[in-house]
């Protein structure tokens, strides 16, 4: 399928976008867009819109997306797939695109019984389907509600990756590249590319 990938440094970062392309390009193609208004036909040949992760305040949403807000909403409401990773997952929530049915998107580090209260990069212990993984995390989100398919969970059992119909959201970074793990405490947790396959399988789950 063809994926429209939003990029705006640093909030929806090139680093995350590059990892997404690396993980998915064996089966999917891409076209890019940013904060400038797209043409009315931009989404006509697109199957999925993707908002990656990055750095900064999620509340920059209004500035960055205002010219394409209606086009994205229309695309998803008409069955187009939405993939959100970290920042992109936050943006699916009720304060932003408001795409979800009775699901709140919130910071994992502020939830009860979390394994960390610090947002800095770490290899987060998660359970992805039936397997335990250490996945790159940078102040990612979790999801509160019942109307979702849970693909992965944090160690406190809060959802980390979910699917609701045509919407797929991930709090951690399966698209992370090897250089993201350059700190000594992260080096042992480089996934050797296995998380790319998890992301590819996840995207292929979307209805």
At which residue positions do the language-model features occur?
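A glycine-rich, often tryptophan-bearing local segment used as a flexible ligand/cofactor-contacting loop or short
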Residues: 57, 61-125
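Catalytic beta-strand/loop cores that center a nucleophilic Ser/Cys/Thr
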Residues: 117-180
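Extracellular ligand-binding/catalytic regions of CAZymes and related secreted enzymes
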Residues: 73, 96, 174-207
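Short, well-ordered alpha-helix to beta-strand connector turns
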Residues: 46-47, 79
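Structural motif
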Residues: 48-54, 167-171
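N-terminal beta1-alpha1 cap of cysteine-dependent amidohydrolase-like domains
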Residues: 1-46
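Hydrophobic/aromatic beta-strand patches that form the interior of the parallel beta-sheet core
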Residues: 31, 83, 98, 151, ...
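Short, solvent-exposed loop/turn segments at secondary-structure junctions
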Residues: 10-11, 55-57, 89-91, 104, ...
